[in-house]
């Protein structure tokens, strides 16, 4: 391990998997002597871990690089600053990033950040440049190991990467590659190490997490690859882990084993994120979603039959090419039927290289904005109604940190709602029962019932 003290600043854009990747980058760089800096001004190495899902994602990165340029020039006389671009913009743009922004020293894709020590050394040699955007997912997790630096009581754990669905609006198959799953033993080793460090809740991550198809535990090879339902049950056996979540799923990969896991695995939280994107079968077909609106609703019905207290969240896109008023009304109808607890909604934006970007019947931006406003009003009302339905209920809350007010605690309900309650600091890291007394669109508040339980 290096004894030279260096400072690292990582700016993370986008999804939970990027948050996980940023944490693992810190793990990789700690043996080199890097410690976290609060701002770029205090850093020797700045990494922009980027997302390419939304419109103008790359331009946002170039704007940030423009802001970093004078800072790098200023530091040139006092040891210098290394700037790296990582993540999905790095994968999509590659060497073009260094052409457009010479301030960048290295570019590393989401499957090769385990090579950061070598790439940094390469970039430092004679002030050169370093680039690696190969797809080497298996090698990455072998190199990363299971030891992680963690804070708090919840952690993300990537179990699956990539996507083979090729939705016509999405860049993920091009930036994250084909679907690949980690072996069960490797995942379990990482989660056991997290539990030993005080983690009480894990969220299993994947671009298509319910497509998980990992090698079974040692000695059980005859069983063949395990699905996500089997993995969830296995993780539930790990001492110290009280709560399990997973995201993000695709309707095509839902199976009865996973649905049944909601019924028979109490540690699996009753909150499920299942994107649908549209309620019109015509638009779903054009998106290449490979399911109909009725098939989506049928999955929700099966989930609610298995776990009556389950809440559903989703994703919606308005203004996809060819969307008519009737298509949009079908989306509103689906939303009314499902009654989402929460739902992310966006205007369609062209992603370069995707089939959707080349479609001729693009929807006017004004129409998109108007439809989004209507949809978001409906979704906001549903979220408020869901939160208000908690009033009078007693919920188990994982207390994560002190609240903003003195003597207050902040925690999360099984449904990922923020919960504020007055209570002693020693409850942090434990699950306590809270009677909900008030609700807003974004949080709940209540009082402790006196019941609490330490982690298993």
Swiss-Prot record:
[4Fe-4S] cluster 1 binds at residues 15, 51, 88. Its cofactor is [4Fe-4S] cluster. GO terms for cellular component: cytosol. [4Fe-4S] cluster 2 binds at residues 163, 167, 170. PROSITE patterns: MTTASE_N (PS51449), MTTASE_RADICAL (PS01278), RADICAL_SAM (PS51918), TRAM (PS50926). Its main location: cytoplasm. Residues 388-450 form the TRAM domain. Its EC number is 2.8.4.3. It catalyses: N(6)-dimethylallyladenosine(37) in tRNA + (sulfur carrier)-SH + AH2 + 2 S-adenosyl-L-methionine = 2-methylsulfanyl-N(6)-dimethylallyladenosine(37) in tRNA + (sulfur carrier)-H + 5'-deoxyadenosine + L-methionine + A + S-adenosyl-L-homocysteine + 2 H(+). Residues 149-385 form the Radical SAM core domain. The keyword Cell membrane does not apply. It is an enzyme of class 2 (transferase). Residues 6-125 form the MTTase N-terminal domain. One of its GO terms (molecular function) is N6-isopentenyladenosine methylthiotransferase activity. Belongs to the methylthiotransferase family. MiaB subfamily. PANTHER family: CDK5 REGULATORY SUBUNIT-ASSOCIATED PROTEIN 1, MITOCHONDRIAL TRNA METHYLTHIOTRANSFERASE CDK5RAP1. This is tRNA-2-methylthio-N(6)-dimethylallyladenosine synthase.
């Amino acid at each position: 391990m290096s004894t030279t003290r260096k400072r690292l600043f990582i700016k993370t854009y986008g999804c939970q998997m990027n948050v996980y990747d940023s944490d693992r980058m810190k793990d990789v760089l700690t043996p080199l002597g890097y410690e976290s800096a609060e701002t770029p001004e205090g850093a020797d190495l700045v990494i922009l871990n980027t997302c390419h899902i939304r419109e103008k994602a790359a331009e946002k990165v170039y704007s940030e690089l423009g802001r970093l340029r004078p800072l790098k020039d200023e530091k040139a006389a006092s040891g210098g600053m290394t700037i790296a671009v990582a993540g999905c913009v790095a994968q999509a743009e590659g060497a073009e990033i260094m052409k457009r922004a010479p301030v960048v020293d290295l570019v590393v894709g989401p499957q090769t950040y385990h090579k950061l020590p070598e790439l940094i050394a390469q970039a430092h040699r004679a002030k050169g440049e370093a680039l690696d955007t190969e797809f080497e997912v298996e090698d990455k997790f072998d190199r990363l190991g299971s030891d992680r630096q963690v804070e708090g009581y919840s952690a993300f754990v990537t179990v699956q990467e990539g996507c083979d669905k090729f939705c016509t609006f999405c860049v993920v198959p091009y930036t994250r590659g084909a679907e690949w799953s980690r072996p069960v033993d490797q995942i379990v080793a990482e989660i056991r190490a997290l539990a030993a460090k005080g983690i009480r809740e894990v969220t299993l991550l994947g671009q298509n997490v319910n497509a998980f198809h990992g090698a079974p535990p040692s000695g059980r090879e005859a069983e063949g690859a395990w699905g996500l339902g089997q993995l969830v049950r296995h993780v539930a056996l790990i001492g110290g882990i009280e709560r399990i979540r997973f995201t993000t799923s695709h309707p095509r990969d839902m199976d009865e084993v996973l649905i049944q896991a909601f019924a028979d695995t109490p540690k699996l939280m009753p909150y499920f994120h299942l994107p649908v994107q549209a309620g019109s079968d015509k638009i779903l077909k054009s998106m290449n979603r490979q399911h109909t609106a009725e098939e989506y609703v049928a999955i929700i019905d099966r989930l609610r039959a298995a776990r009556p207290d389950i809440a559903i969240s989703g994703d919606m896109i308005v203004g996809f090419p060819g969307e008519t008023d009737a298509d949009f009304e079908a989306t509103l109808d689906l939303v009314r039927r499902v009654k989402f607890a929460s739902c992310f909604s966006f205007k369609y934006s062209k992603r370069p290289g995707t089939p959707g970007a080349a479609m001729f019947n693009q929807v006017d931006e004004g129409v998109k904005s108007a439809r989004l406003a209507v949809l978001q009003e409906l979704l906001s009302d549903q979220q408020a109604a869901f939160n208000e339905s908690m009033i009078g209920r007693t919920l188990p809350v994982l207390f994560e940190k002190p609240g903003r007010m003195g003597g207050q605690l902040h925690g999360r309900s099984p449904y990922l709602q923020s919960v504020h309650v007055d209570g002693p600091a020693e409850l942090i890291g434990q699950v306590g029962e809270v009677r909900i007394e008030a609700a807003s669109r974004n949080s709940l508040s209540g009082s402790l019932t006196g019941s609490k339980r330490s982690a298993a």
